[in-house]
């Protein structure tokens, strides 16, 4: 039987040698007092009792991962005791045949209890190093309080004797629970539940007694088989979580590399790739991956973000657990928060004019809050006011009401305001400390000396001041930059002369545009990573159908507009062709009238010559003969008139001829006959109707003279018909406010303004402007200015519609008239003065050539006209 001072127990799974090592060194008296035979007998008795207790109380748990538990009893085969060697250190030979390293146990000591109880706890520690052929190690430590510790594979198992279940292991390894052996009568009794602390003694015996011990302690074969099962289950426990993690990460890396190299996986998500790798690993090692997931070691992310760079923006791949629509429905139910009309308009404007409306709205709100804070601060503190308030009491009330609002805004805007840093030398202010530190590195010249920006040191030498910066402040000072004279607006290069800068700017601008075009990112560059991460979503069929219908409607509207424009163009072309035909007919009629006049003049000249010849012959015949046959003369004159084709004037001509014949009969002289011929010529010229009445449409300023009616004048501004020249002058003065101060005598010399294109003459400047636009498509500078002021009104000559303004726009849009600008040069008829404004010419005539001026000057030609420079 073992004494009460020794409670060292060692168990092994196979036949091994056991070395007992002391935890506390023995004294010399104890080692000399014990005898060898007594010690052997005590150990034998102790071994028999331990074997009986261990067979009933030892339990071995199975593999926790497979969910099976097995009970095994400890078996002791061989105990070898060596009493010739005592040592507190573990055996140096700690390796078996397989080379597995042995482990050393740590003695467990409990601290002393409370002093008022007056008892100390007995600490029993056992340290045992066991090695078998397979390298399994098991250490058991017993304590007086009924708990046993198993340190096999680094785990500790405790069992409480008061009907409590054993606690499970942390990492799921094998658990062994042993019951406390019955105390010997020679052991001290616990006092008040506390054990008495006593020293522990370990005894080592020689190897000579191994045979006797082996004969005594022969184990049962059944128990040996159960211990072998415990050994088999302890081998897979070495594959812990760390190794499983390493294997899983290695497999994930290999799988991702394989998927990355395949061209068909370019559009696959990163999260999908990771899930595929994990599924592949689950098929190979389901238990290890399951344990990693249960222990929350393997956690899949919901978001994978790529940081922004100079190539691409910030990209985030997100697989949310709950979509945003569900969150909104959970917060607000089926009814979403309704926006007011002003909020809807503001949101629509932001979406229309800004590519990122939400961020723009955030920045706008921050800016508005800052502006409101500054404004309310001025009102509350009565500073920077535009004017002095009239009623101070009302102003104080308003300021008192705005003060809490200002304080709220001030607290709200605190994150957006930074402290201003000021340079003591030059007064430069900035919110950035980095900018201020860079600014202070520059030398400051105050006009007469250099001033240090970090202290009060001054010096007149720039080099000494730089040395001061370096020696005192450890800063390499930089010279102050010179003020730019002629900098380039693009590259900020400075030039001494402006001309050199302009030449450089032209080339720099070309290079800048070319570089910008090269550096401009393309759509493929922006969407490269997006295409790799996820595919482009397919369009909804209904949305696609709506888009197609909208495209068809737009195409139809475009075709209709083109047809309408073509019809309008055809109508305008037909109207222009008709107008050209009318103009050609008028020109032909004018040419025919001129030919008739020329023929009449030739006929009258022939008649006059014939009359002169006949009169000369009559005189000679009168002198030679008394009577002359005058009938031949009358017949010749009538025949000549018939050849001319003038039937309307034959009566007047015949009357004149009869008078001439009567004069001839009365034997008047040749002078009277010549006078009659001249009078006939003048009367024919007066009574011959003018064919210029056909110019009524093109030259409205000319009067139409009928044979029995008064002359009619067509207004050159509004196309109104007016009888008599005096009424026409009154119409221009009252209706159009033109020719103010003019009298009827001023209109006797004809219209003063003439067109250089068609030689038509006009009374007013507005009539000339209207004629140039309608007939020739020329726009003067004054008319263009009127169009910009919405004052270009009037009557259209083409369609006859009246417009209060936008006449030029009507001509371009409706009649497809091509307008071009024209510069009118006005010249004075009296002197060589020329100008580009009609008002300037009027002022010149009024000041330099008044009506009462009798000075003779170069008369103005009848065909003087205004020159147009297109």
Swiss-Prot record:
Q: Name one GO molecular function term.
A: RNA binding
- ZnF (CCHC-type) residues: 486-508
Gene deletion effect: Worms exhibit temperature-dependent arrested elongation of gonadal arms. Mutants raised at 25 degrees C show reduced numbers of descendants of the gonadal precursors Z1 and Z4, while mutants raised at 15 degrees C show wild type gonadal development. Vulval defects are also temperature sensitive. Mutants grown at 20 degrees C showed protruding vulva (80%) and some had pseudovulvae (15%). At 15 degrees C, fewer mutants exhibited everted (36%) or additional small vulvae (7%).
Q: Name one GO cellular component term.
A: nucleus
Instruction: Kindly state the tissue distribution recorded for this protein.
Output: Expressed in somatic cells of embryos, the head, hypodermis and tail of larvae and the germline of adults, including oocytes but not mature sperm and spermatocytes.
Q: Keyword Repressor, does the record have it?
A: yes
Protein name, entry field: MOG interacting and ectopic P-granules protein 1
Q: Which organism is it from?
A: Caenorhabditis elegans
| Name of the gene | mep-1
